[in-house]
């Protein structure tokens, strides 16, 4: 064998060895990645974050509970309660204790020593994670005694309070979910999670307006699902998110960090996030922008029938919504039953002698015309366990924490005592009480809380004769109704309160069919995030998807006829508003801020280094009777502050008038001087409403009408008398 041949064989062997070693090393790395432990995170949730104030326990056997969910892509592996507890000094430590249970399983019984009574103490309770499920209840039962002999089970000394600053620390481990469209909207939205929905959106650079419009439709759908939680949609261009996210791509515009194939039809798919294999990406794809929109519409309209790791959309068809066809607003076409306003009839029922209130959320059309009306009629039916004697048991009805009516709960009529009774058939129930009441118009806003508080009086039987059985049941009948069908739609604008609270006038069409959103710069992530935030908020307010809105640039806005305009922040938006609004109260123009105050009639121009944001509303210069709402600011921080103010429910009541200034977390509003009206009234309503605002003119009109009528009557009588005299004159 020659030396050359030997060297070739050795080289071949070494090359084979290196390739094998590299392959083996790659297999080991893949194995390590696949076998890597699932990520674990620790979350601390206060009782206040769970929607609870202080938990007050009153009586010998009182109960309070917390409710929360566990995400489908997480499993609880550890849980600890940190309680801040205050209890009565009168409790006997030998008999009294606080019992804690998780989903019906008792996990702890805390003693209540006298030495710690009367002031706040801290207790830590470790909970067994095996007891947790998708929906969880942590229940607190106070077992309280103040005497070794006869007791009053409702004695005022039997109490304990859990502070809202108490918290629950959850340790959760991620669960790998399969690539399955049938799980949607999980994991991108999980109704078990009560926190704000944060859902990143990924685009290639640059993203076209039509692509952003399609993404906005998806944002409105997720905002509708998020509801009270709120939703934010961080935007990234060619940068993978560090959590579950959405991807929007066409064949000509695909994010660089994803190896997406080209497609010929609208396609939906779920894939692993290359940044973290435990995270998922929902990918919307189309050959072009039209197909991309069809893919998004296929999700929001047909998610109930999606299965598998991917799906193609073959056809999408939908009709435009009519005005005021808004799922989350009370219908103006008919009376609405209370049962339609809750998810389950169980939400209209309570138990106990001091139960929590039954609460209904009433969302009215913001332009409901209630002028010169006594109010909104309610046909109320309710049931309750009748007290044994006439006492102070009552049902109190409030609207927005204002007392509306209070009804005495009376005993049932005495029966013959033979033990016989009628089984109710359909609505025939002898214990049912019916009341007609009217909610005063001045008590109502766009969003209202109507509460029904039952309070049953406890009867003390005497010393050592107490047998406490708290088996009272109370309910509001689901067939109770509220009727706004006789009201017209008419509103005075500009009024930013209607926009902040209900998205009006854009949400008058639930699909935003007469709305144009003006996006000044499609490459500006701040403006794009503002777009998605607002569309998600509209979805929350209407309960519908924004399928029909238009997305324009500032040049197209100049000719946007017969549309309400929503202008997003950006330098070009400031230029557009400056072009339109020499009479507007605030302008950002050429680095200056021009502010015009109506009281006194003055104008000032300033240059300032700090951030200033604003919400501005005025009548559209393009089409009279149409509305412009603009979110403007001096910089990106100001734009973010405006969005944050709209997303903070505690700040929304401060937004009103035609201008709201936003300086950090401080809001200041003012009322405009130029008012215009939208909607329609019957001719006589229009006449009386507008003349009522000018009392002197109305008086003069009435006098003129009376004089004209008198002259007409006088002239008619004169002619009638002349006809009667004509025959006599002829004779």
Segments (PLM) and residue ranges:
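N-terminal secretory signal peptides that target proteins for export/translocation
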Residues: 1-8
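Bacterial N-terminal signal peptides
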Residues: 11-21
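Sec/Tat signal peptide C-region and signal peptidase I cleavage site
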Residues: 22-26
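Solvent-exposed alpha-helical segments and adjacent loops
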Residues: 27-731
């Amino acid at each position: 064998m020659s030396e050359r041949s030997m060297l070739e064989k050795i080289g071949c062997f070494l090359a084979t060895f290196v390739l094998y070693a590299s392959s083996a090393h790659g297999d080991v790395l893949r194995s390590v990645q696949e076998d890597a432990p699932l990520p674990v995170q620790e979350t601390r949730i206060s009782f206040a974050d769970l929607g609870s104030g202080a938990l007050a326990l009153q009586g010998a056997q009182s109960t309070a509970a917390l409710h929360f969910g566990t995400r489908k892509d997480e499993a609880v592996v550890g849980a600890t309660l940190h309680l801040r507890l205050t209890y009565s000094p009168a409790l006997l430590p030998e008999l009294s204790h606080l019992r804690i249970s998780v989903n019906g399983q008792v996990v702890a019984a805390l003693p209540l020593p006298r030495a710690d009574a009367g002031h706040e103490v801290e207790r830590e309770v470790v909970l067994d994670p095996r007891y947790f499920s998708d929906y969880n209840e942590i229940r607190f039962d106070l077992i309280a005694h103040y005497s070794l002999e006869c007791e009053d089970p409702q004695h005022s000394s039997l109490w304990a309070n859990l502070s809202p600053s108490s918290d629950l620390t959850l340790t959760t481990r991620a669960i790998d979910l399969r690539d399955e469209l049938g799980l949607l909207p999980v994991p991108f939205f999980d109704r078990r999670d009560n926190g704000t929905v944060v859902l990143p959106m990924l685009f290639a650079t640059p993203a076209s307006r039509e692509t952003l419009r399609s993404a906005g439709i998806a944002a409105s759908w997720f905002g509708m699902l998020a509801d009270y939680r709120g939703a934010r949609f961080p935007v990234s261009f060619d940068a993978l998110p560090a959590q579950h996210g959405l991807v929007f791509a066409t064949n000509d515009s695909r994010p660089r960090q994803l190896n997406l194939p080209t497609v010929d039809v609208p396609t939906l798919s779920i894939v692993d996030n290359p940044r973290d294999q435990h995270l998922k990406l929902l990918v919307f794809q189309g050959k072009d922008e039209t197909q991309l929109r069809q893919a998004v519409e296929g999700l929001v309209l047909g998610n109930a029938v999606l299965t598998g790791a991917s799906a193609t959309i073959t056809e999408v068809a939908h009709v435009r919504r009519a005005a005021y066809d808004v799922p989350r607003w009370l219908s103006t076409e008919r009376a609405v039953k209370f049962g339609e306003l809750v998810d389950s009839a169980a939400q209209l029922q309570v138990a106990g002698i001091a139960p929590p209130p039954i609460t209904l959320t009433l969302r009215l059309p913001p332009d409901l015309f209630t002028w010169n009306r006594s109010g909104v009629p309610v046909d109320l039916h309710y049931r309750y366990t009748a007290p044994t004697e006439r006492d102070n048991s009552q049902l109190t009805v409030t609207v927005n924490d204002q007392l509306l009516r209070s009804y005495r709960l009376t005993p049932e009529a005495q029966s013959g005592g033979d033990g016989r009774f009628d089984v109710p058939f359909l609505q025939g129930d002898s214990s049912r009480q019916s009341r007609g009441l009217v909610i005063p118009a001045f008590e109502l806003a766009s969003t209202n809380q109507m509460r029904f508080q039952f309070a049953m009086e406890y009867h003390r039987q005497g010393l050592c004769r107490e047998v406490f059985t708290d088996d009272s049941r109370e309910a509001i009948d689901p067939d109770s109704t509220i009727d706004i069908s006789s009201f017209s739609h008419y509103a005075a604008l500009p009024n930013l309160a209607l926009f902040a609270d209900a998205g009006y006038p854009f949400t008058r069409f639930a699909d935003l069919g007469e709305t144009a959103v003006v996006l000044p710069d499609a490459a500006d992530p701040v403006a794009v995030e503002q777009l998605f935030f607002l569309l998600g908020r509209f979805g929350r307010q209407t309960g519908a998807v924004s399928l029909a809105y238009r997305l324009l640039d500032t040049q197209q806005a100049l000719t946007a006829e017969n549309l309400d305009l929503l202008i997003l922040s950006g330098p070009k938006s400031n230029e557009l508003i400056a072009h339109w609004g020499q009479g507007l109260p605030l302008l950002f123009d050429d680095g200056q801020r021009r502010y015009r105050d109506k009281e006194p009639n003055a104008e000032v121009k300033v240059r300032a280094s700090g951030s200033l944001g604003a919400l501005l509303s005025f009548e559209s210069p393009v089409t009279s009777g149409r509305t412009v709402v603009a979110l403007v600011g001096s910089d990106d921080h100001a734009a973010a502050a405006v969005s944050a103010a709209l997303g903070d429910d505690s700040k929304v009541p401060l937004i009103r008038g035609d201008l709201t200034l936003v300086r950090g977390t401080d809001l200041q509003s003012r009322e405009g001087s130029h008012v215009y009206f939208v909607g329609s009234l019957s001719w006589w309503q229009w006449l009386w409403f507008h003349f009522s605002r000018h009392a002197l003119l109305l008086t003069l009109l009435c006098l003129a009408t009376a004089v004209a009528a008198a002259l007409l009557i006088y002239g008619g009588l004169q002619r009638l008398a002349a006809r009667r005299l004509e025959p006599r004159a002829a004779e």
